[in-house]
Amino acid sequence: MRNEKRKVQMQSAKLPLKAVAIVALVLLAVSSAVISVDAHMPGAKPLPEFELEPISIYDGDTLIDISLDDIGDYHGEICVCGGCAFRATQLGISKILGDEIPARDDIKIVSRLPTPGSRDCFQYITGTGPGIETKTKGEYKVILPDGTAVVNLSNKDLKKASNDNTLDNFRFEVCRKSTGECFEVVLKLGVFSEDYFELRKKVKFGIPENATSEEKALFKSEWEDTRDKFLTSPDWELFEDVEEPEEEEPDVVGGATFLLILVIGLILLVALVHSRKKAS
C-alpha cells in the first residue's frame, strides 16, 4: 500500500515538471517570434558603396551636416525606412528651398509611415527625438493615409500601426513653417516588389499565417534590394514628380567651328612654308 502511495506521489510530482517544461517551451517560442519582429534584418548583406550628400541645416547659429550614417547610428542600422526617410527629406528640402540651407526649427515633416526607422530619421533631423543634443526643434508628426494621427510613437505602437503598411504609406510632406510651403514626396510604384508588403506581413507579424522558410529568404532578399535602392538610385527613379535631367547634346556647331579653324590654320601654315621656300 505504501509503495502504491509513493508511486502516486511521484507521478503527481512529475506532472508539474512537465507542465513547467511545456510553458517554458511556449514562452521561448513566443520570445523568438518577438525577436524576429523587433530585429531589423538578421543576416542582411553588407551595405553597398554609396555617396549621398548630407542634409545641411542651421541649429540656431550652428551649421550642421546630417549624414545617412548619422541616422543609421541613431537608429541602430541603415534600414529600408530610414533610407527612404532620409532621401525624402533631402528631396523635399531641395524642392522648397533650392540651394538655401533651412533652419531646424523651420522644418515640419508630416509622415504617413508609422515605422521606427522613419521615425528615428525624422526625429533626428528635426531634433525632436530623445538623446539628441540640439538648440532648436522642428516639428514631426505621423498621420496615416486615412487621417488617423499616431500620437504614441513608441516602437510597440508604431509596429502595431504598421502591420497594414502599403505603398500609400510612403508619402511625406516636407514643409517650411515660416512660409507654409510644402512639398509632398511620393514613392514611385515599382520601388517595392509586388509581393513585398504581403511577405512583410507574414514574416514580421504572422498575418494571415507564419511565413515559410522560403518566404523568409525571399523577403530578406527583397528587403536588401529595396534598402540598396535608397542608397544608390537617383531621385527620379525613386520618387514621383522628379524629372530625369536631360543629357547634354554634343556641341556639333562648336566642334565643326573648331575643325574649320584648324583646317584654315593648317592651310595658312602650308602656304607660309611654301612661300618661304620659293623666296629662298
Q: What do these predicted ranges mean?
A:
Residues 1-40, 248-280:
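Secretory targeting signatures
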Residues 38-78, 86-249:
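Non-transmembrane, aqueous-exposed alpha-helical and coiled segments at domain scale
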